[in-house]
Amino acid sequence: MMMVVFFTAGFPCTLKARLGKLMKKNILILNTGGTISSVKTNHGYEPAQGYVQSALRNIAALTHVDMPHYVIKEYNPLLDSSNMTVSEWNRIATDIATEYANYDGFVIFHGTDTMAYTASALSFMLENLDKPVILTGSQIPLSEARNDAIDNIITSLWLCSYDPIKEVCIYFNQHLLRGNRAQKISAQRFNAFDSPNFPHLANIGIDIEVHRELLLQPSGKPFRLQTIVPHFIANFRLFPGFATDVLAYILKQPLRGLVLETYGSGNAQNNEPRFLQLLEDACNRGVVIVNCSQCPHGSVHMNQYATGCALKHAGLISGHDMTPEATHCKLLYLLTKNSDVNHVKQYMEMSLCGELTH
């Protein structure tokens, strides 16, 4: 049964009438950089140390009686998200774990280019999460007169004080998305993110529609941080006429895992014996190869066509309807937790925190 909670216009005030007055929540903002923190320079937009912290003081809505308290921690240096690595994921996750008992929720200001990767990684690293972690950013910097940053900031903070949300999300342009289902879909539009294979958790307009039945339920187990150890894994996207020698070179490296981005429902050429043999040999050596569709919508079904069945016979496992970003991060996470290949394969095909459906 679908359960949708509606809040109406002027949402902080009418919230009291709908749910009763919320207790004042304490939110920690982690500012990692990105467009939201950028100012114009001679080299284009670059994140500017101290700018966001100063600018937030001038946003009147943030001092509204029904908005949560917030504290902002700014990273130094601030990063364009193109420069994000596993080290930054570990730092963000560790900061959340360190302050976990002191705050009711966490908002992360982040660049848009790799936000889906960071959200996916955090969803696995923050085990048994029972507080909201919301990533947001903007397509136009907060430093510009016309920007999308202010609404994203205000609404992220407000949603972060809404009790039923206890998972890693992305909030962007009136939509709350599960973090490990999200993908960046536009470099130009304010509607920069979507979750093609999963409904929005909330839609924000005059009415605020929170789809409570879609929200992850806490496991009841103690919160635990699992940092990620960098492993030699790769994503390889197929294209018509690709050179098998390129894949051969990649598979000669000491790989632990490969995300193979295939056509349609998980298909690849089956008329090139060397290609299939390369994959089979790698699987036999203990390389975990995950079949992930290039299509934003739909799922991998390796029994549907002969071209998919050949990959299954070679030893590939199904990525089901996971995004390439979530598949990559989940593989890193599982390889860190357990070195047993069969264990990793088993858990790759299980939903750990809402990242896939069978």
Protein language model regions, located:
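Accessory alpha-helical/coil subdomains and C-terminal extensions
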Residues: 24, 30-34, 40, 52-64, ...
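C-terminal non-catalytic interaction/assembly regions of soluble proteins
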Residues: 265-358
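Short, acidic/small-residue loops that bind anionic groups at enzyme active sites
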Residues: 119-150, 157-163, 282-293
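Short acidic, glycine/serine/threonine-rich loops at helix termini
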Residues: 40-43, 119-120, 145-148, 178-184, ...
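ATP/NTP phosphate-donor binding region
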Residues: 23-98
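Internal gly/pro-rich beta-alpha loop/helix module
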Residues: 135-205
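Short Gly/Thr/Asp-enriched flexible loops that form oxyanion-binding sites at enzyme active sites
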Residues: 108-131, 270-278, 307
